[in-house]
Amino acid sequence: MEEKVHRESSMIYITGDTHGDFTRFSAKRLRRTGMELTKEDYIIICGDFGLCWAKDKTFEYHCKNFAEKPYTILWVQGNHENYDMIGEYPLEEWHGGKVRHIIRDKVILLERGQVFEIEGKSFFAFGGASSHDIQGGIVNVKSYAYP
């Protein structure tokens, strides 16, 4: 029988550039890497998350899936994001900075230029960049195959 390790505090994991490939967040895959995430834990995605691209069935599927995860995903905008769609969500205060709750308290966009206090640590959200693969940094959402 496996013995569960008791942790005294939450964990903060950092990754980036998921580009809509959310298989790395499956419980089975996380367990294989030794990660047993709880409701106190956070995963910070440093840009190009890929969730908010179009409000379609895929978006709804992933929203439902992430809402059922025990942990919270925090995400900073990258250069491949649908900024118009993100802008539809209201700005709110959270842990000292401005955020947009994309999926209730499960997926939270950390606004650029903000400082957040999370578990006694300070995090500065510095996201976005010019797109080397999109002319002028402007994309027609309907013509771009994302992810």
Placement of each model-derived feature along the sequence:
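Active-site-proximal loop/helix segment associated with metal-binding centers of metalloenzymes
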Residues: 105, 119-147
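Core catalytic region of metal-dependent phosphoesterases/phosphodiesterases
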Residues: 2, 7-8, 15, 20-118
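Acidic/glycine-enriched edge-of-secondary-structure segments
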Residues: 12-20, 141-146
